[in-house]
């Protein structure tokens, strides 16, 4: 399973946090992937909107994963 799903659909960049069992806590690897996508989209004039969402019902994001 991928911890963060990054995709582009037209002018929308989408980042989905995908660690519902860990309340979508961010790992260092996830942060690096998100940063890479944001830098890429900043340089892409086609991307006008960045949408961040999360899988799971309990939490959007509980913050940084302290066990990582």
Predicted regions and their residues:
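Short, flexible, mixed-charge acidic loops at enzyme active sites
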Residues: 63-68
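Conserved CoA-thioester-binding segment of acyl-CoA-metabolizing enzymes
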Residues: 1-60
